[in-house]
UniProtKB/Swiss-Prot annotation:
Protein name according to UniProt: Eukaryotic translation initiation factor NCBP
GO (cellular component) term, any one: eukaryotic translation initiation factor 4F complex
Organism expressing this protein natively: Oryza sativa subsp. japonica (Rice)
Acidic residues composition-biased segments: 27-36
Record flagged with keyword Membrane: no
Family per record: Belongs to the eukaryotic initiation factor 4E family.
A single GO BP: translational initiation
Gene: NCBP
Keyword annotations from UniProtKB, A to Z: Initiation factor, Protein biosynthesis, RNA-binding, Translation regulation
Ranges where the record places region Disordered: 1-43
Amino acid sequence: MEPAAEKREAEQEELQQQHDEPAVPSADDDEAEAEENERRNRELKAGFHPLRRRFVLWYTRRTPGARSQSYEDNIKKIVDFSTVESFWVCYCHLTRPVSLPSPTDLHLFKEGIRPLWEDPANRSGGKWIIRFKKTVSGRFWEDLVLVLVGDQLDYSDDVCGVVLSVRFNEDILSVWNRNASDHQAVMTLRDSIKRHLKLPHSYLMEYKPHDASLRDNSSYRNTWLRG
């Protein structure tokens, strides 16, 4: 077997290992859940339709060729929302992917999670990656946003957020999850994404753990799994 093939096989075996023990709910988790329940009750009384979680939309616009720019410094919060009504107000005012400059990223994440590899919620996780022609990316992005906000993905508690990356020749959608070593959760999430987006069989999905992205300083190169 060639060294490159051996490396890929070893990486995939590493991804399939499940070392993490089940998380034990903490007092902070209980407090956060109580706050969420209180928030939903307030919104119901006000006549709104509360989402299960509050979400934050972030925007990144990097200047081509400006390598000295800090990625974290470039991430700007646009808005947050927690009801169906506030979501649609926000979404209807967003610029559509076809009109966004390259390179640009839109990040829709659960409140409390920043769209950074180093964030505590993301550090042990990874992302599923799907590449689209620019002519069709807008429809799939909208479907993915609705699936996330509607809490429809399998292993939804393991999902951190979704990203639209507008590039010169293509647009890329990615779904970030918390635990790259939980092979069952990773593969079930892949199947759930395919099902909800109604992806044609010709579309290839790639997976990359965030620690690998940190090592090679790249979001979308050198992916581990394909399927």
